[in-house]
Amino acid sequence: MAADRAQNLQDTFLNHVRKTKTPLTIFLVNGVKLQGIVTWFDNFCLLLRRDGHSQLVYKHAISTIMPGAPIQLFEGGEDSPA
């Protein structure tokens, strides 16, 4: 049944950067900048690792996530996700 359910963009993005260990820059709503790689995530938070230290970051505190390298989530051109 889980295979029939399409993954949302947020989960697809986070799963891709987790699997590829893509370095991220995360800006929080209060302006704080965090950097690291995602090692785990769920519906409410993600675990960010850098220099051997992990930080639990609540998703409601995140404003922007910028990958350190270009990523390709979907097959085809830039306007194919829909």
Swiss-Prot record:
Pfam hit, one: Hfq
Keywords: RNA-binding, Stress response
GO MF, one annotated term: RNA binding
A GO biological-process term: regulation of DNA-templated transcription
Segments forming domain Sm: 11-71
UniProt similarity note: Belongs to the Hfq family.
Role, per record: RNA chaperone that binds small regulatory RNA (sRNAs) and mRNAs to facilitate mRNA translational regulation in response to envelope stress, environmental stress and changes in metabolite concentrations. Also binds with high specificity to tRNAs.
Name this polypeptide is given: RNA-binding protein Hfq
Origin species: Rhodopseudomonas palustris (strain HaA2)
Annotated gene: hfq
